[in-house]
Amino acid sequence: MHHDKRCKESNMKIVKAEVFVTCPGRNFVTLKITTEDGITGLGDATLNGRELSVASYLQDHLCPQLIGRDAHRIEDIWQFFYKGAYWRRGPVTMSAISAVDMALWDIKAKAANMPLYQLLGGASREGVMVYCHTTGHSIDEALDDYARHQELGFKAIRVQCGIPGMKTTYGMSKGKGLAYEPATKGQWPEEQLWSTEKYLDFMPKLFDAVRNKFGFDEHLLHDMHHRLTPIEAARFGKSIEDYRMFWMEDPTPAENQECFRLIRQHTVTPIAVGEVFNSIWDCKQLIEEQLIDYIRTTLTHAGGITGMRRIADFASLYQVRTGSHGPSDLSPVCMAAALHFDLWVPNFGVQEYMGYSEQMLEVFPHNWTFDNGYMHPGEKPGLGIEFDEKLAAKYPYEPAYLPVARLEDGTLWNW
């Protein structure tokens, strides 16, 4: 009898699950779950260039099956939507599950009246080290941008740069002083040209210039964005060892995890991989064979708090640390959740922080703070993030796509 009563009292029935697609500068997909006692939770389901697919997956399939369930039963709901779909994994399915999971953790932490990081096990550090993006169309521009971010207090800085002889290069803003936004609005992706030879010849010159001017005080990061073959990546990693990079990111497409062994055999430059992964299975071989140093999976794409916690725990056995993807195409809801996760997770490495426009942050009033290179999620119960539905409605969805890349002879390549 007592047991039944206790179960009944702990039941927090879900009465509403709503999906919002809004474009305050770029598209975001937000899930809002409401319980019968009025507690709400938010989850991010944004999948850049495929937002409507995740929105319909949630609206048509998951939201109706959430109604009447106990919001406290996060693990059971996660398993139900993962195993119950029969078709497991994949970016659309996992982004939808991630949003549900994030919203339920928001609710649970609010019900417990504590910030999410406390519910996860409390802070493991004073603050969350974040890295910023710096770019320039020339080395001098990149150095100026680096200096600006250094003055802001960033301890970890990613550098990208325009390459002589190439009209387009990954990581460039559309114009001087503009924030970098990879997606282009319209019905068709932008096509960009790529030359591995020009990249391999030029990029070490950028790192040399940065280290010569600024020294080794900051962690230096660089994103290769899946562009190189394994042997090219091995050669590149070897050639930049003197610059003591914090990591080289996504050196080669990671579907073939075996090929990272070849890179490892040739260079001690640390490797970070995983922003396009959507489950622990994508990470398994890379982690257990110690072929990478940082795992970049995200809360929005890899199963929410529940999925990411498994990945991080597994990675900790092999001294692989987290370095979660954090561009502005994951919404402020994901960033809020990520900062709670990062503050708690024992094997934390670094968190990417690209930042958001004022317009975006008006739609998603946030509670996190930045101080001298470190962020903190704040002490509000739950994720500490809100969603202004009325304002969001003023920014309807606009089709936008990430670019595609072609080699100079026209061959479609990895963007």
Curated annotation (Swiss-Prot):
Substrate binds at residues 48, 133, 275, 296, 325, 329, 352. GO terms for molecular function: magnesium ion binding; mannonate dehydratase activity. InterPro entries: D-mannonate_dehydratase-like, D-mannonate_dehydratase_GalD, DgoD-like, Enolase-like_C_sf, Enolase-like_N, Enolase_C-like, Mandel_Rmase/mucon_lact_enz_CS, Mandelate_racemase_C. The keyword Metal-binding applies. Gene3D superfamilies: Enolase-like C-terminal domain, Enolase-like, N-terminal domain. Belongs to the mandelate racemase/muconate lactonizing enzyme family. GalD subfamily. The active site is at residues 170, 225. It is an enzyme of class 4 (lyase). Binds 1 Mg(2+) ion per subunit. Pfam families: MR_MLE_C (PF13378), MR_MLE_N (PF02746). SUPFAM superfamilies: Enolase C-terminal domain-like (SSF51604), Enolase N-terminal domain-like (SSF54826). Has low D-mannonate dehydratase activity (in vitro), suggesting that this is not a physiological substrate and that it has no significant role in D-mannonate degradation in vivo. Has no detectable activity with a panel of 70 other acid sugars (in vitro). The gene is rspA. Its EC number is 4.2.1.-, 4.2.1.8. Mg(2+) binds at residues 223, 249-250, 275. PROSITE patterns: MR_MLE_1, MR_MLE_2. This is D-galactonate dehydratase family member RspA. Signal peptide: none annotated. The record marks 327 as: Important for activity and substrate specificity. Keywords: Lyase, Magnesium, Metal-binding. It catalyses: D-mannonate = 2-dehydro-3-deoxy-D-gluconate + H2O. GO terms for biological process: amino acid catabolic process; carbohydrate catabolic process. Its cofactor is Mg(2+).
